Amino acid sequence: LKKPYIIPDGYGIIGIVFILAILGGYFISLYVAVIPFLLGVYLLYFFRNPTRTITAAANELVSPADGTVMAIEWVQEDSYFFKKCRKIVVFLSVFNVHVNRAPLAGTIDFQQYTCGRFKPAYKEGVGYENERYSIGINKGTHRILVTLIAGILARRIVSWVSLGDRLDHGQLYGMIKLGSCAEIYVDEDVDILVHIGDKLRGGETVIGRIIS
């Protein structure tokens, strides 16, 4: 089944903005139509869903999102792993593709939505303060945790999956609207293959490899 190039979640707001542009241009002035028209063009760009080819091996983790690696660190994770693990933080600007993909094939065995604040997603510590949505993906022999974090502009996290769903490698499962951050938590048996500052492509860039 061919996937739409524009995410359906954006149809409503895109349609409203272009209708405002048409009405403004028709009843008031073409100059009035410029701002909503440009906003509509940007929203088409923001809600894009480009085709990605998943070529990673079964033991390789792909990036869940487009963006830039902000941090790689050891942390104590107390909602899914309940132990120290490594966290990779990816910042998504308003110009990145914002759909999110499963880094690994497996079953969703954990799902948690947490209300919070809307601080800028690039600031340190927002993963503990901002609104966020997490899923745990269980491959059978290995598990990972992915957390999507809202930002100062990103006020809504959209999920298209439920607890118990089976995800394919690189499968779309959600998005964060208008600038955000994604965190990937992995066990010690994963060899991290990216570095701070690296640019990532969701579903294509290999960020880690299971070594056991």
Give each language-model segment a name.
Residues 1-212:
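Contiguous, well-folded functional domains in the mature portion of proteins
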